[in-house]
């Protein structure tokens, strides 16, 4: 009798659990996909969170467009203050769909990505200003070319890939963050890595590297000036 009762419970509970599991993971926004142009300008920094796929390119005029399910696209807020374009949702909802965002602007200074945002930046190779990139959460970004100087701050499980050339690459990496810059020719590199982070850099003249915790800094090149500091299991390794 007890065995039959347990079987009956399993037959009732299992479909219910499967339904709840599916309901938690399905995309709640089944509205039609739209393209929406956004009338914003006067910014040189971009901040974005949530689940956006952001593509940024250099152009002579400002242009911003979002593509995705209508309900989600129409719930995005676009605010400009202190030269920052801040992209967020007005209302928090789990399991948002990925929204594609295209941004064109003449001058680009800083990118802040958080959450599960992915980003691609192109067209700013050789820019005379410092390009600053801040990644947190599980964000990922690719820079196809960068400015004369590039500053980075990578934390969480974020990952930055950079190619091109620059006079100086400097900044901090922590947590499980990753910097992949073997394809970026840098005259000078000044990197501090901590936690379980990893950095891969290419340097020609000057290397300043500090690795703590279980972090690793891998470098290619034979810089004449090297200032290397390690502690707590951190390593700086020539490739």
Residue ranges and their predicted role:
Residues 2-13, 19-73, 84-104, 119-121, ...:
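Short acidic/polar N-terminal linker immediately downstream of export determinants
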Residues 15-16, 133:
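Secretory-pathway extracellular proteins and peptide precursors enriched for disulfide-bonded cysteines
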Residues 44-56, 101, 108-239:
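Extended, compositionally simple hydrophobic/Ser/Thr-rich segments
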Residues 81:
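Short, ordered coil/turn segments that flank beta-strands lining enzyme active or ligand-binding pockets
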């Amino acid at each position: 009798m007890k065995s039959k009762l347990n079987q009956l419970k399993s037959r009732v509970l299992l479909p219910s659990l499967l339904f709840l599991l599916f309901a938690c993971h399905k995309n709640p926004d089944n509205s039609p996909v739209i393209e929406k142009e956004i009338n914003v300008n006067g910014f040189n920094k971009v901040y974005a969170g949530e689940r956006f796929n952001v593509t940024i390119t250099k152009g002579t005029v400002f242009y911003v467009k979002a593509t995705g399910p209508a309900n989600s696209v129409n719930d995005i807020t676009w605010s400009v203050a202190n030269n920052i374009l801040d992209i967020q949702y007005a209302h928090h909802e789990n399991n948002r769909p990925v929204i594609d965002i295209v941004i064109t602007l003449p001058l680009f200074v800083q990118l802040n990505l958080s959450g599960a945002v992915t980003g691609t930046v192109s067209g700013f190779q050789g820019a005379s200003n410092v390009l600053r990139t801040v990644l947190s959460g599980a964000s990922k970004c690719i820079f196809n070319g960068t400015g004369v100087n590039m500053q980075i701050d990578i934390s969480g499980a974020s990952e930055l890939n950079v190619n091109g050339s620059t006079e100086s690459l400097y900044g901090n990496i922590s947590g499980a963050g990753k910097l992949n810059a073997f394809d970026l020719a840098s005259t000078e590199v000044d990197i501090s890595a901590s936690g379980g982070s990893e950095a891969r850099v290419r340097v020609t003249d000057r290397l300043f590297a500090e690795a703590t915790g279980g972090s690793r800094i891998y470098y290619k090149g034979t810089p004449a000036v090297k200032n290397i500091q390690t502690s707590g299991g951190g390593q700086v390794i020539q490739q």
